[in-house]
Amino acid sequence: MREEAGPFNYLACQTRALRLCPEITDNLVKREPFRVQDGPVYVGEWSRELKQRAGKGMQIWADGSVHEGQWARNKAVGLGRLIDADGNLYEGYWLSDEFHGTGRYQSIDGNVYEGEYREGVECGVGTETWPDKSKYEGQYFDGLKEGRGKFSWPDGSSYSGEFRQNDICGYGEYIWASKNVYKGQWKANKMHGQGEHVWADGRKYVGAFHEDFKEGEGKLEWPDGRSYTGSWM
């Protein structure tokens, strides 16, 4: 994977890393490869004054994981790239050895996330894509889809609205590949609460839903003008 990714661009990370940790340019020397206390091998710059990893460097673990980028106070900081033992790749900003800021994560399975991180997990706004062409664009919190977003499926179906802990939950609009449309409340990925369902053939139902089914009070209208208002079970 490291050969496929190519050389890491240290120049791109200089400005951001210096702003985060200005001392990383102080008294830096290039050290020969050495093993740090917790086991990995470090190759790169070193703070002579602080006796710590600082500046540009690469760290290699026994399992083959490799991190290249900026260091300060013995921790990854600024822009860096990690390729783990399984071939998963992250390139982006770091703070105190954690993904923090904007970055791109590509799993060995082909899933890709591009967006914001906080303390090692997706948090903020991002885009996630899968090999089957599914795509999510929206908000994340604590590593989960949370807030407003849009999920698109390869068959042309899409959902735009609220998510809670990775589930469709709250208010949103779902458009099926068949062009049926539902606007309303959701719970645990199911139509649940008040909503409006319009079919491609012109039928329309407005009323209560329970776990994807019409249940409670509602009104169903047909294209020919007929309608029914009442209770559904």
Predicted ranges, named:
Residues M1-M233:
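Intrinsically disordered, low-complexity repeat tracts enriched in Gly/Pro/Ser/Thr and acidic residues
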